[in-house]
Amino acid sequence: MLLIGEYTEFPAWLPADPGSGIALFNSTEGAEPFANTVLSVHNPSFLCADGYGGFYALDEGPQGLLTHFIPDGKSFYFAEQVAFEAQGSCHLCVSPEHKIYISNYDSGTLTVVSDNNGHLEVIQTLYFHGGGPVKSRQ
């Protein structure tokens, strides 16, 4: 199975056609892959396996949003979602202890979320101050 995140909207200055969220592609050996399901998620900027057959989807928007999907046969269903104070969420990784670390580009923060048997909870946000070499992007 292959998961592909597609941005659902773009800024007006970027001439691109919006995607539909998350497309799931399945195939059997020797067969052509096909998209059988589309999960509606706003601007999924990063997808990451949860270690149990499901995955997390990160929404890159004006507020941080993490969505957890659980497998259901050949597709997935929505399990839980948690919002957090951050802008421009762009990457996540999952620790063996089921802590989810989320980097947020625009707000310059790192958000830590715990997954306690399917219950998502924001446990910490780290704030960074200063800037990088390209001042116009900070």
Q: What do these predicted ranges mean?
A:
Residues 15, 31-38, 118-126:
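Extended intrinsically disordered, low-complexity coil regions enriched in Ser, Thr, Gly, Ala
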Residues 3-16, 57-61, 102-106:
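Conserved beta-strand positions in repeat-built beta-propeller and related beta-rich domains
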Residues 11-28:
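Blade/loop signatures of beta-propeller domains
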